[in-house]
Amino acid sequence: MIVKVKVKPNAKKEEIREIQKDYFEIRVTVPPEKGKANSRVIELLSKHLKIPKSRIKLKKGEKSREKIFEIID
């Protein structure tokens, strides 16, 4: 399964919104440096989708706000 995410780093509070099926807007409080925001996005996706973090892989957009994640079965 492929999930698209629009990330908003340095937010005042963390939030995850499902814009449409398999497309999320995620706000994280951490800065976009040294992979901190990406790690936090994976943690939030994991909790929201109720799956282990190890099943979520960043496929595209490591340094972009628009990201594509693969959920591994």
Swiss-Prot record:
Lineage top rank: taxon: Bacteria
Protein name from the UniProt record: UPF0235 protein PERMA_1406
Family: Belongs to the UPF0235 family.
Native organism: Persephonella marina (strain DSM 14350 / EX-H1)
Coiled coil, from the record: none
GO-annotated cellular components: cytoplasm
A Pfam entry, by short name: DUF167
Cross-referenced SUPFAM superfamilies: YggU-like
